[in-house]
Amino acid sequence: MIRAWSHYSRLVRLHVIDGTYELFRAHYSPRPDHRAPAGWDAKATVGVVSSMLALLHDAAEAVTHVAIAFDNPIRSFRNDLFDGYKSDEGVPPELHAQFDAVEAAMHALGLVVWSMREYEADDALGTGARRYADEVDQVRILTPDKDLAQCLRGDRVVQVDRRQKKTTDEATFRATRGFAPESVPDFLALTGDTADGIPGLRGFGDKSASLLLGAYVHLEAIPEHAFRWSVKPRGALQLAATLSAHREDALLYRKLATLVDSVPLAESLEDLRFTGVPRGPFEAWCDSLGVTALRTAPRRWRDP
């Protein structure tokens, strides 16, 4: 059960945010188009700034420490492991052109930015969740991406889907999914993850994978033959044959889905403390993008 949080101002909460998701969401949202005075499409960048201001103003979220991570570019070491893994291919050029711009906008807001190249934004989020969890009351991972569920830890590390207004802790995840957060990479190896280009194994769906991992936790522990299984998903004989024939593929897919939790992040927890929006840089950013209405939007300014 999610802990009932009260006296927000007394809590130390670290929000780690999937900036790439925020950028894509803003680009494809119905919000009005916006072009910077220089002529480039700035809709997504302005959208992310508006989204972050809403978060910073949300009394229920009560942000005290914050970092936002971006894939820049959308390519990592995983592309060297598997040709089909997600990449920049197919990203609209007007969106791709905003990858650097949105990071600059986040700096203007006073947020710590984790710009990932060799690793992915998700790896930075996972690293932050592991590294700082024991120093704060709660780490809140802001993304709907299902692979981040592997980071859940009691109600100390939770996942927040702002769009659905849903917060998931470890107990909720176990109750609804039927397996442990540590099994998430194994689950994605079996079922696939279209967003990341992981194909999964033919025939495995949510129900069969959940049953098996609820019983065995990891791929290596699943017996080779179905008659030895303690659970009986539909089509067990064929599933066992598929897993036996494609076990190496499954192990590769699991490696792709396993977050790196040792990304070299330079910041201490104190570096992540949100102390307000720096007025000069933010107002200059607003002027450069022609969004003067946002100049007075922040409710908390950083002391000079």
Model regions and ranges:
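Short hydrophobic transmembrane-like helices used for membrane targeting/insertion
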Residues: 1-2
